[in-house]
Amino acid sequence: MEKQVRVRYAPSPTGHLHIGNARTALFNYLFARHQDGKFIIRIEDTDVKRNVAGGEESQLKYLKWLGMDWDEGVDVGGEFGPYRQTERLDIYKKLYEDLLERGLAYKCYMTEEELEAEREGQIARGETPRYAGNHRDLTEAQVKEFEAEGRIPSIRFRVPADRDYTFKDIVKDEVAFHSNDFGDFVIVKKDGIPTYNFAVAVDDHLMEITHVLRGDDHISNTPKQMMIYEAFGWDIPQFGHMTLIVNESRKKLSKRDESIIQFIEQYKELGYLPEAIFNFIALLGWSPVGEEEIFSQEEFIKMFDAARLSKSPALFDSQKLKWMNNQYMKKQDLDTVVELSLPHLVKAGRIGETLSEQEQAWIRDVIALYHEQMSFGAEIVELSEMFFKDHVDYEEEGQEVLKGEQVPEVLRAFAGQVEALEAMEPAAIKAAIKAVQKETGHKGKNLFMPIRVATTGQTHGPELPNAIALLGKEKVLXRLQKVIG
């Protein structure tokens, strides 16, 4: 009988959920759900100094916002807990003590200064820096001497000599490492806390993880973890290392890269939709059959085949994300779009936090003008700018339009029509423009463009009668008068 698929996403609470981690979580989630397996969240919080307040809560909050759920974890429990590494220290202790007893690990009393001097010497000689094994076989007398000096040891794993470590990677196919390329590595730090490679190997085994899907930057950790599995006689899970995400300059995506918004909470704050972010991230290093790019979560689960994980770096295309979010925005009802937009208009000082019924209806109509055009909620501030300014600046193209010989005649006639209107309704504005056509004989672009540029400042924009109606009589007449002179 085949084992049930069990995968995990194991963040460190050293920061908030960013694109790279979100992709790792998402691919594990899709892999598990596609195969009716289990998706586990484990918190790797042993690097206590780097943990940030609220980091764990933020990770879980934004995974949920993206639409993911999990079967086991810190907040939902499960039979393989605890799911927080700092609550598993006794488990690790028993196991590393077993390695010490069997001579597969040993105490190393070298100081940071001694290790740094060794490293610098290796670099100066053109060698690859690695631990040279100075404390591999200490005598009892040497150990007593170091302890008398008050030295606190770390524990190192004794790397087997002359061994090949080969594994079939789900993404990269066969990957090989040689043990002689590794020095004996630390499995327990001087403070008694296990290192990443030891704790991860132990947890993955005890939690019965069948597949380890993670970023390419972890591939050099794999042979070390394989050595630990081997030392305990444990079955080794299947590994899959997803390719890097690169920016538009084809450089590895870095948290310090300011050209790209990195954190999921920032996208939420900007008024992006979780379904669109889910869709976009799911295509960063994985592709379905065919050309279609918009899929629901259920569709992704149904078709997610790990064999289609890409071997090439995944390009993070910000413009494509905007396009994709726009596709999802178009499908939303107006209430949702208004809800995504209002906080940004308040933040920009365009509207107050409390609105009268009349103001609510007006701003709703303004947002409706841009529903089809908006890429994300915060974009409404820039798109709707003309409604909140007394005067408009004309685009270069618009300035050329206003130089036309017919412009004064058209605008005077239109101003007269607007002046006579009892109510600024789109139908009435449409009728007023038709009346100007009849009165002046101008039509098409010669008629519409001067009116659009004079009233909105733009050569392109939303439906003109609707926009003019929402601008209001006073603002429209003031703008027309400015051009007429």
UniProtKB/Swiss-Prot annotation:
Where the record places motif 'HIGH' region is: 11-21
Record motif 'KMSKS' region, residues: 252-256
Write the record's keywords in alphabetical order, separated by commas. Answer: Aminoacyl-tRNA synthetase, ATP-binding, Cytoplasm, Ligase, Nucleotide-binding, Protein biosynthesis
Name the UniProt record assigns to this protein? Glutamate--tRNA ligase
Family recorded in the similarity comment = Belongs to the class-I aminoacyl-tRNA synthetase family. Glutamate--tRNA ligase type 1 subfamily.
Q: What terms describe the molecular function in GO for this protein?
A: ATP binding; glutamate-tRNA ligase activity; tRNA binding; zinc ion binding
SUPFAM superfamilies given in the database record: An anticodon-binding domain of class I aminoacyl-tRNA synthetases, Nucleotidylyl transferase
Q: What is its EC number?
A: 6.1.1.17
Q: What class of enzyme is it?
A: ligase
| Localization per Swiss-Prot or TrEMBL | Cytoplasm
Can you state which reaction this protein catalyses?
Answer: tRNA(Glu) + L-glutamate + ATP = L-glutamyl-tRNA(Glu) + AMP + diphosphate
How it assembles, according to the record, is: Monomer.
Please state the protein's primary subcellular location.
cytoplasm
Q: Which GO terms describe its biological process?
A: glutamyl-tRNA aminoacylation
Q: Kindly list the organism's lineage.
A: Bacteria, Bacillati, Bacillota, Bacilli, Bacillales
Question: What's its job?
Answer: Catalyzes the attachment of glutamate to tRNA(Glu) in a two-step reaction: glutamate is first activated by ATP to form Glu-AMP and then transferred to the acceptor end of tRNA(Glu).
Residue numbers binding ATP: K255
Q: Name one Pfam family in it.
A: tRNA-synt_1c
